[in-house]
Structure formats: structure tokens, C-alpha cells
């Protein structure tokens, strides 16, 4: 091969040599990649410069045509590039090398920095054929060197040798800074490589740095040598590895992984007195960095709900052409060919630095949380561990602690499931023990937080404000008795006792209601299907409750209203074991004296044994309680309720005429039933069943199409399939484009259908953003929204949807034609002056024994209706029901007692049932009890 030199040594040089002419097109296509790898300028000379050998001897074929190639740049760079090009065009050896699949991140991660450095060091062409397989070709010496280096990587990876603690810490820190400076979707895979392999990779990156006695961070890799010489002032010459950093620099280098990445980039745009060419993208050790003034880099990520398990991170640069989008990098991840892949990545502006952008610690926090969430860990556990250890800890350390915390949480859940009678609600302690369910993608907050501690504190307060009930209880006070004293005598809380902790939940003085909380009863223990009377509840109401604490060792959880024979033996003990409203606080000495007041000492022993046997599972020592938390959470209660089967049965029977179209906001209903943590399809089925039993047959449920995809936060999706089969479910359009979800606003479908059919929208959303859209929509939002609530699996709607002065529920759900006929019939009846003084007018009630069927009307105030035959055209709308039977009254009384278990309210329940013999509406009767 012919070659001629114009210069020698390390200075600028020029070299010309020949290659086969058929490689011209290949070299032209690889020009950008070669120039970026070796910092040289490549020129393929024109045809007139072609070199041809002398004529061959007779009888031999003529030699192939060759062309001249010219390289300009540093002497060493020119020699390396020449050897690399010769190996590409005329390879002497070609080998395949296998490696473990977990090492794939080395050859494709960190924006191909390690692979490029390996090519620069060995001058062999290395490409990734598939995961676990490399192709190495070039000169014989170059191929052997590359093979040896790859085999060394594999050996270090498989042996997984550890280094000394001090050395290992430095290596991890330097390696983390480097890979985060070239972040991509393989960043986390690189961070968990063995420390010995990390040291070898850093040595590979620093080899050229040592030879050239200086290190230059080059982030472009696309400029020619002439252009690079003009940009001297934009480079930084770093100090030697043995240089020591001052206290100020040590403080500057402390922080989270991303802030350290920022400090590593501080030197990029500062001035330098001199510069020299070295292989591209050489990063020095941390000790060699000189920090001037803080610049910044920005990490951008996608938080779509169905995104890939590994988030892709990148850096942005506004100086480059903005037409190249971030999606291009995700497409190139699927291309394994290094020749076509690397050149594009080197020129991609998404890997450069953007000046003037600040990295928010909130974004760093979200990156860590989202990464561990994709590994299957609960967000609350991840947030808890990061809050304790901080964001600057090694990811592998975080992973180990998260795994330990996850195992501890699973053991607590198993223990809690074995003690279903737990009544102690340790409020606020487990507010973060469940996943958040959000309808929209997570977005980055623009305002950065001051410190990591402030970030965690704010996030904890936000969880508590949403999930925590109104009453605040000190759960760390081990041996105390909280005594509930309601202000009003007619509204007292339920009995709740415990051996070490007794809590009486109620409304706090400063409690405020929010959209995420509904006004309903709070069961203190999971309901038992076979024994409904054993369930204790806290009566709902707005009365203030005062709770005091006293040291005590003895308490009882009473379930039945009647006291035991032993409790009847002494009035003092009866007072002490009675309701919270009559309980008096006593010191331990007073309690001991009361126990000794029994005539027979055996009685005191019997009572003490009964107290201990009443709750054997609550005999937990103080030290043991620190590890096992017996309190129950809303998520656990919801998951327990899913174990009770529910079957949706829509009977094939004609519905009632003159009823409005029911349009259900499926997302709103499902999230409300799932305690705002799950998308509960059972809630949608319960709502549909409620309106079906009322006689409605025109029912439509709108749910976004992406909710039909498999997701752990979506429960019992078979109900959606069942509703879709009968034509009740309608899916609003949504699609995925490049990993991002594009979904239509389902609320618009609700309003459009309500406008066309004159129907009623069942939702708790106020549609505030659509009030100004049109007058028709404003009228729908004002007059045709039906709110609801869930009490467990009971779907409840108000009797007065538009307020106290508005129409009743039955009138609200009737179509316009039937409402006009009803008003005209009432006027005709009133004109005849024939009234009944005792019998109110009711709509027909089918099968009052069903708890989900609702009555049709209710008399209010002093208004009374008439006992008159109805006209022919009114029989379809109205009919007079018979008086409530004794069995129905008993059933309603038992249902109300389940909701209001307090003895004082039972008298009120009996009075209401006696005063309203025609009332079958459980919702209306419950409202009367509360009134």
C-alpha cells in the first residue's frame, strides 16, 4: 500500500495512502464517524489522483483500482485513524466475541462512549451484531488487542471482585459522574456494574488523557480540527490526578448525583489558556476537576403511564438545530449497527448541554422514584427509603434498602390480614402505603425545592392532607386510654377499647372537608357477612369530640350493647367499661383500688382474665409494636372488600317509561369507589345496577379506552367487558404514539350526549372548565348533574339533587313529558279539593326487600297528596303503594342500626319509622336520622 507522510511526531500531520476504489462510497458514508472518533479530517481524493500500479506480467489478472485517502490532524490521531481505515477496507482478521447479556449496556450505553474509546484504543472496528455478540475486524494486532480487552471486561464482570472501601468509593463516584454526564436509558444498568469493571472502564477512558498530558471534555465530536482550534476558549484543561481540592471545592462537589453531574459540566464553557487534541470524550477523575462557577444541564424524561420500564434521559442544546427531536434517540436504540448508529448519535443535539437551565431537585427525586417504581416497588416505600437515605446515595444501596423495606411491609400486611378484628385506626401512619392513582401523566414541577428534606416533608404533608381522617391521634403513646366525650348527648361515637391504645375517632375542631373525602360512616372493623351485628361503626355527624389520655394497662373492646354478668356486679366497673360518653378518666392507682373493691378477690381475677381474653391478639408488647404495625389502612380494607364476590345481574325485564337517559362518568365513579387509589370497575357495575333496578334502560357509561389495558391499579376489569357486551359501556378514543398517550377528554362526550338526549350526568365533577363553552352545556352543568357517594359497596344518591328547594330525585330523573303530565294531574287533583291528611303520594316501588332499590318520592313538610283514582294517561307514571309491611319495617330498622349502632339513636330510628309508615328509602331515612 502506497503512503506518503508530510509530518511526523505528535504535532499536526498529513498522511496520504491508498485503499481499494470500491470502498469510496463506504468511506464517504463513514466520514463523519471517523472524524468524530479520531479528531482528524478525512478526504477521499478525486479520480485524477487515483494511483494505479505498473502493468502486471503477462498471464496475470490486472490489480484492482485504488484511490488516495488523505488524513489531516494530530500525528498520533492520524496514525490511529489510518490503521482503523485500513482495517475497515482491507481487514486482516475478523472475529466474533461473546459477552454476558448484562454487559450489553457497556457497548451501547453512555452514548457509546465506552465502545468509541475501545475503538480508539485498539484501532479495530467493533460492532454489536446482537445482544451478547460482538464483531471485531481490522488488522491482526488490533483485533487481538480488542479481543483481549473484551475478555478482560467479561472476566471482571463474572468474578465481581470488590475493591478496598476507600478506592471503591472514589471509583463509584467518578463512574457515576461520567455516566450521568452521558445519560441515556442504560444509565442505571451501568451504575450497578461491579466496581472492578467500573475501574477498568474509567482506565480505558483515561488512557488517551494520560498520553496527551491533559484532558479536554469534548461534547460535540462533530467539528473538524480547524474548527476545534478556533474554539480554544471554550475548552478547559484539567489539573493532574494528584492535585488536591480545597475545602470550598469539596463543598461544591457534595450533593445529589445530578448536581454532581452539573458540577462536572462547570468547566465546559469557561476560558482556558491553551488546548490540545486528544481522543474524543475523555473524562478525568473527580479529583482533577476545577470548579469555577455553576453551570447547569437539563435532564428530560417521559412520565407516560405506559412508558418503558427504563426511562430515557437526555441533555438538550438550544444552539443546535431544533428539528432533531428527542424521539430520534429512542428510534436509534433499536438499531444495532454501529456504523450507521454512532455517527448520528455524535451529531445529535439532544446529547449536548443547554446553558441557563436549572436542575430541579424535584426532577431528580422523580427520576429516582419512577425508576424504582418501574421495578415493581410501591411508590410509598421508595419515597420513604429515599427520604431516609437521601438522593445522593448509590442506586445499589437504595435498591437493597427498598427491598428490605418491601419485605418488611409484606410481613406487616400478612400480620394485619391475620388479625381482622383490629379496631385501632392509627391515623396518618400508613397514609403513604398505597399507590397513587392519577388520570393524567405525571408532569415535572417548575419550582425547584430548597432541599431534599423540604421536598420529602412537603410530599408527606400532601399525602396526609388527602388521606388522613379529620381526627389526629398520637400513635406513639404506648400505654394510654383515649376517652371520647361528645359535646351533644344525641351524637356520640361508638365504643372502641384496646389494651394499650384506645381511640375514639370523630370530627376534629379544625377539620375541613375536601373533594377527596366523602361524608360517610367509618367502619372500625371489617364487616362479617355471617354476623352483621358484630360490626362496630363510628356514627357520622359534625359534633366536636374531645379526646383525653391517661396511663392505663386494662381496657376492653365491647361489641354487644348489654353488659356481662361480671360487669353488672359493680356500678363503678360498669361505668368504666361503658360507652365513651360516660367513661371517666382514672389513674392506674384508682383503677387498682376499684379492682380491689370486689367482695371476693376471685371476681377481680375473673374480670381481669375476661379483659385479657377479649382481645388476645392485641397482647402486644411495646417493643414488638415498633416492628409490627397492627393498624389497618384504606388500601387493605379495599382489597379485603374485593375478596367478597360481587355479581352484576341485569334482569331482562321492561323498564319504566318517562325516565331520563343516565350518563355515567365511569372514571369518576371508579376512582371514587377505589378510594382514589384504584380504578375500581366494581364501582361502575354497582352504579349501573342501581339505575337498572330503578327502571332505567337508557344507560351509558363512558370510560377512556386505555383503561381496558392491563394495569395493577385497575381492578375487576371483567365488569367492563360485561357492560360492553350489553351495550352500556362506551369507550372514548385514545391511542399511543411513540410511547405517549393521546386521549380525548371524556367529559366532552358526557356533555355532548346529555345535550342530545336530555339525560342526566352521574358524576362528582363540577365541569368548571366547560361552563363557558356554550349555553346548552351551562344549563346541563347547572341543572342536570347528579352527584353520588359510596358507603362501601352501597351506591347512594341524594333525594334532593339540586338542593333543599329543588325537585325530589324521582322528579329529577323523570323525562320532561312525564313531568308535565304529573304537574297537570296534581293541579287537577287540587282543584277538586280532595286531599288525604295522612297518605303521601308515592311512585311505584318494586320489591322493597332489595337494598339497592330506591323509593320514588317522599313527603316533606305539611304537604299531603290525594287518595283519588288516576286518569288513564297517568297510570303509566303514578300508582299508590301500600303501607309498609312489618317485615319491611324490621328490615329497614336493622339496616339503619348497622349504620347507626349507638343506643341513643335507636330510639330516634324507631320514632322515624313510626312517623313515616310509607317510607322505604334507606337513604332518606338515614338523612332523617342525621337531621
Curated annotation (Swiss-Prot):
<feature type="region of interest" description="Disordered">
    <location>
        <begin position="547"/>
        <end position="571"/>
    </location>
</feature>
<feature type="domain" description="KH-like">
    <location>
        <begin position="75"/>
        <end position="159"/>
    </location>
</feature>
<feature type="compositionally biased region" description="Basic and acidic residues">
    <location>
        <begin position="290"/>
        <end position="309"/>
    </location>
</feature>
<dbReference type="InterPro" id="IPR056629">
    <property type="entry name" value="KH_N4BP1_1st"/>
</dbReference>
<dbReference type="InterPro" id="IPR056630">
    <property type="entry name" value="KH_N4BP1_2nd"/>
</dbReference>
<dbReference type="GO" id="GO:0001818">
    <property type="term" value="P:negative regulation of cytokine production"/>
</dbReference>
<dbReference type="Pfam" id="PF23050">
    <property type="entry name" value="KH_N4BP1_1st"/>
</dbReference>
<feature type="region of interest" description="Disordered">
    <location>
        <begin position="289"/>
        <end position="329"/>
    </location>
</feature>
<protein>
    <recommendedName>
        <fullName>NEDD4-binding protein 1</fullName>
        <ecNumber>3.1.-.-</ecNumber>
    </recommendedName>
</protein>
<keyword id="KW-0540">Nuclease</keyword>
<dbReference type="InterPro" id="IPR056578">
    <property type="entry name" value="UBA_N4BP1_C"/>
</dbReference>
<keyword id="KW-0399">Innate immunity</keyword>
<dbReference type="Pfam" id="PF23054">
    <property type="entry name" value="UBA_N4BP1_C"/>
</dbReference>
<dbReference type="Pfam" id="PF11977">
    <property type="entry name" value="RNase_Zc3h12a"/>
</dbReference>
<feature type="region of interest" description="Disordered">
    <location>
        <begin position="841"/>
        <end position="863"/>
    </location>
</feature>
<feature type="compositionally biased region" description="Basic and acidic residues">
    <location>
        <begin position="456"/>
        <end position="467"/>
    </location>
</feature>
<feature type="compositionally biased region" description="Polar residues">
    <location>
        <begin position="416"/>
        <end position="434"/>
    </location>
</feature>
<feature type="compositionally biased region" description="Polar residues">
    <location>
        <begin position="547"/>
        <end position="557"/>
    </location>
</feature>
<dbReference type="Pfam" id="PF23052">
    <property type="entry name" value="KH_N4BP1_2nd"/>
</dbReference>
<dbReference type="GO" id="GO:0004540">
    <property type="term" value="F:RNA nuclease activity"/>
</dbReference>
<dbReference type="InterPro" id="IPR051101">
    <property type="entry name" value="ZC3H12/N4BP1_RNase_Reg"/>
</dbReference>
<dbReference type="GO" id="GO:0005634">
    <property type="term" value="C:nucleus"/>
</dbReference>
<dbReference type="GO" id="GO:0045088">
    <property type="term" value="P:regulation of innate immune response"/>
</dbReference>
<dbReference type="GO" id="GO:0003729">
    <property type="term" value="F:mRNA binding"/>
</dbReference>
<keyword id="KW-0963">Cytoplasm</keyword>
<dbReference type="GO" id="GO:0043130">
    <property type="term" value="F:ubiquitin binding"/>
</dbReference>
<feature type="domain" description="RNase NYN">
    <location>
        <begin position="659"/>
        <end position="811"/>
    </location>
</feature>
<feature type="region of interest" description="CoCUN">
    <location>
        <begin position="884"/>
        <end position="931"/>
    </location>
</feature>
<keyword id="KW-0694">RNA-binding</keyword>
<keyword id="KW-0539">Nucleus</keyword>
<dbReference type="GO" id="GO:0005829">
    <property type="term" value="C:cytosol"/>
</dbReference>
<keyword id="KW-0391">Immunity</keyword>
<dbReference type="GO" id="GO:0045087">
    <property type="term" value="P:innate immune response"/>
</dbReference>
<keyword id="KW-0378">Hydrolase</keyword>
<dbReference type="GO" id="GO:0032435">
    <property type="term" value="P:negative regulation of proteasomal ubiquitin-dependent protein catabolic process"/>
</dbReference>
<feature type="region of interest" description="Disordered">
    <location>
        <begin position="413"/>
        <end position="474"/>
    </location>
</feature>
<comment type="function">
    <text>Potent suppressor of cytokine production that acts as a regulator of innate immune signaling and inflammation. Acts as a key negative regulator of select cytokine and chemokine responses elicited by TRIF-independent Toll-like receptors (TLRs), thereby limiting inflammatory cytokine responses to minor insults. Has ribonuclease activity.</text>
</comment>
<feature type="compositionally biased region" description="Basic and acidic residues">
    <location>
        <begin position="435"/>
        <end position="444"/>
    </location>
</feature>
<dbReference type="GO" id="GO:0016605">
    <property type="term" value="C:PML body"/>
</dbReference>
<dbReference type="GO" id="GO:0031397">
    <property type="term" value="P:negative regulation of protein ubiquitination"/>
</dbReference>
<dbReference type="InterPro" id="IPR021869">
    <property type="entry name" value="RNase_Zc3h12_NYN"/>
</dbReference>
<feature type="compositionally biased region" description="Basic and acidic residues">
    <location>
        <begin position="319"/>
        <end position="329"/>
    </location>
</feature>
Amino acid at each position: 500500500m502506497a503512503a506518503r507522510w508530510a509530518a511526523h511526531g505528535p504535532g499536526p500531520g498529513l498522511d496520504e495512502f491508498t485503499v481499494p476504489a470500491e470502498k469510496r462510497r463506504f468511506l464517504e458514508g463513514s466520514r463523519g464517524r471517523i472524524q468524530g472518533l479520531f479528531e482528524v479530517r478525512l478526504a477521499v481524493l478525486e479520480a485524477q489522483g487515483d494511483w494505479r500500479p505498473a502493468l502486471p506480467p503477462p498471464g496475470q489478472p490486472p490489480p484492482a483500482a485504488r484511490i488516495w485517502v488523505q488524513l489531516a490532524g494530530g500525528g498520533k490521531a492520524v496514525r490511529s485513524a489510518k490503521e482503523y481505515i485500513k482495517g475497515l477496507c482491507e481487514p486482516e482478521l475478523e472475529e466474533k466475541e461473546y459477552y454476558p447479556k448484562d454487559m450489553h449496556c457497556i457497548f451501547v450505553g453512555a452514548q457509546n462512549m465506552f465502545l468509541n474509546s475501545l475503538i480508539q484504543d485498539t484501532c479495530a472496528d467493533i460492532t454489536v451484531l446482537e445482544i451478547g455478540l460482538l464483531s471485531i475486524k481490522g488488522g491482526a494486532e488490533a483485533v487481538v488487542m480488542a479481543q483481549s480487552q473484551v475478555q478482560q471486561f467479561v472476566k471482571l464482570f463474572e468474578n465481581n471482585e470488590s475493591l478496598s472501601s476507600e478506592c471503591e468509593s472514589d471509583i463509584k463516584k467518578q463512574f457515576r459522574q461520567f455516566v450521568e454526564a452521558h445519560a441515556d436509558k442504560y444509565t442505571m444498568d451501568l451504575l450497578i456494574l461491579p466496581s472492578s469493571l467500573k475501574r477498568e472502564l474509567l482506565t480505558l477512558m483515561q488512557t488517551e488523557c494520560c498520553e496527551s498530558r491533559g484532558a479536554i471534555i469534548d461534547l460535540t465530536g462533530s467539528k473538524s480540527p480547524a474548527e476545534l482550534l478556533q474554539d480554544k476558549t471554550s475548552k478547559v484543561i484539567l489539573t493532574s490526578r494528584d492535585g488536591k481540592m480545597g475545602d470550598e471545592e469539596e463543598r461544591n462537589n457534595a450533593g445529589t448525583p445530578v448536581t454532581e453531574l452539573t458540577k462536572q459540566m462547570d468547566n465546559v464553557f469557561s476560558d482556558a489558556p491553551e488546548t490540545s487534541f486528544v481522543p474524543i470524550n475523555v473524562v478525568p477523575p473527580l479529583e482533577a476537576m476545577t470548579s469555577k462557577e455553576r453551570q447547569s444541564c437539563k435532564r428530560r424524561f417521559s412520565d407516560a403511564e405506559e412508558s418503558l420500564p427504563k426511562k430515557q434521559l437526555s441533555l438538550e442544546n438550544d444552539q443546535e438545530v431544533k428539528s432533531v427531536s428527542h424521539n430520534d434517540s429512542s428510534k436509534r436504540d433499536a438499531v444495532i449497527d454501529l456504523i450507521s448508529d454512532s455517527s448520528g448519535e455524535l451529531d445529535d443535539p439532544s446529547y449536548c448541554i443547554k446553558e441557563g437551565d436549572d436542575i430541579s431537585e424535584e426532577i431528580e427525586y422523580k427520576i429516582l422514584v419512577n425508576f424504582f417504581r418501574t421495578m415493581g416497588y410501591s411508590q410509598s416505600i421508595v419515597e420513604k427509603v429515599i427520604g431516609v437515605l437521601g438522593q445522593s446515595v448509590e442506586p445499589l444501596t437504595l435498591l437493597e434498602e427498598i427491598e428490605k423495606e418491601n419485605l418488611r411491609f409484606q410481613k406487616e400486611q400478612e400480620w394485619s390480614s391475620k388479625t381482622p378484628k383490629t379496631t385501632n385506626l392509627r391515623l396518618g401512619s400508613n397514609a403513604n402505603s398505597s399507590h397513587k392513582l392519577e388520570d393524567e401523566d405525571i408532569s415535572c414541577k417548575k419550582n425547584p425545592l430548597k432541599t431534599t428534606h423540604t421536598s420529602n416533608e412537603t410530599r408527606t404533608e400532601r399525602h396526609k392532607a388527602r388521606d388522613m381522617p379529620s381526627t389526629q391521634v398520637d400513635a406513639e403513646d404506648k400505654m394510654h386510654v383515649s376517652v371520647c366525650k361528645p359535646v351533644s348527648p344525641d351524637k356520640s361515637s361508638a365504643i372502641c377499647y384496646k389494651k394499650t391504645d384506645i381511640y375514639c375517632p370523630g370530627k376534629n375542631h379544625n377539620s375541613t372537608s375536601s373533594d377527596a373525602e366523602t361524608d360517610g360512616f367509618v367502619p372500625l372493623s371489617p364487616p362479617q357477612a355471617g354476623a352483621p351485628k358484630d360490626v362496630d361503626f363510628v356514627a357520622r355527624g359534625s359534633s366536636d369530640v374531645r379526646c383525653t389520655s391517661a396511663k392505663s394497662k386494662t381496657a376492653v373492646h365491647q361489641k354487644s350493647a348489654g353488659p356481662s354478668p361480671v360487669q353488672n356486679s359493680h356500678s363503678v366497673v360498669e361505668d368504666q367499661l361503658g360507652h365513651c360518653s360516660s367513661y371517666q378518666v382514672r389513674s392506674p392507682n384508682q383503677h387498682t383500688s376499684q379492682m380491689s373493691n370486689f367482695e371476693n378477690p376471685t371476681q377481680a381475677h375473673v374480670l381481669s382474665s375476661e379483659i385479657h381474653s377479649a382481645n388476645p391478639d392485641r397482647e402486644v408488647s411495646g417493643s414488638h409494636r415498633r416492628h409490627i404495625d397492627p393498624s389497618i389502612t384504606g388500601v387493605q380494607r379495599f382489597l379485603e372488600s374485593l375478596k367478597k364476590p360481587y355479581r352484576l345481574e341485569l334482569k331482562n325485564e321492561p323498564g319504566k317509561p318517562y325516565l331520563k337517559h343516565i350518563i355515567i362518568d365511569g372514571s369518576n365513579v371508579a376512582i371514587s369507589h377505589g378510594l382514589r387509589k384504584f380504578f375500581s370497575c366494581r364501582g361502575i357495575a354497582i352504579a349501573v345496577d342501581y339505575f337498572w333496578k330503578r327502571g332505567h334502560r337508557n344507560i351509558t357509561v363512558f370510560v377512556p379506552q386505555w383503561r381496558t389495558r392491563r394495569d395493577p391499579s385497575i381492578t375487576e376489569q371483567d365488569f367492563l367487558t360485561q357492560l360492553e357486551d350489553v351495550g352500556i359501556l362506551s369507550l372514548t378514543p385514545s391511542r399511543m404514539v411513540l410511547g405517549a398517550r393521546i386521549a380525548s377528554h371524556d367529559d366532552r362526550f358526557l356533555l355532548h350526549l346529555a345535550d342530545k338526549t336530555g339525560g342526566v350526568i352521574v358524576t362528582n365533577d363540577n365541569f368548571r372548565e366547560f361552563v363557558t363553552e356554550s349555553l346548552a352545556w351551562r344549563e346541563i352543568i347547572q341543572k342536570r348533574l347528579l352527584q353520588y357517594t359510596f358507603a362501601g359497596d352501597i351506591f347512594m344518591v341524594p333525594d334532593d339533587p339540586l338542593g333543599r328547594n329543588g325537585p325530589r330525585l324521582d322528579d329529577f330523573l323523570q323525562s320532561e313529558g312525564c313531568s308535565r303530565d304529573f304537574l297537570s294531574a296534581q293541579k287537577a287533583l287540587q282543584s277538586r279539593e280532595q286531599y288525604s291528611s295522612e297518605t303521601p303520594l308515592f311512585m311505584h316501588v318494586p320489591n322493597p326487600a332489595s337494598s339497592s332499590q330506591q323509593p320514588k318520592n317522599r313527603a316533606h313538610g305539611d304537604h299531603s297528596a290525594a287518595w283519588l283514582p288516576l286518569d288513564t294517561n297517568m297510570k303509566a307514571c303514578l300508582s299508590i303503594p301500600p303501607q309498609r309491611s312489618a317485615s319491611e319495617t324490621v328490615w329497614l330498622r336493622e339496616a339503619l342500626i348497622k349504620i347507626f349502632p349507638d343506643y341513643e339513636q335507636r330510639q330516634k330510628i324507631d320514632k322515624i319509622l313510626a312517623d313515616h309508615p310509607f317510607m322505604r328509602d334507606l337513604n332518606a331515612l338515614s338523612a332523617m336520622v342525621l337531621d
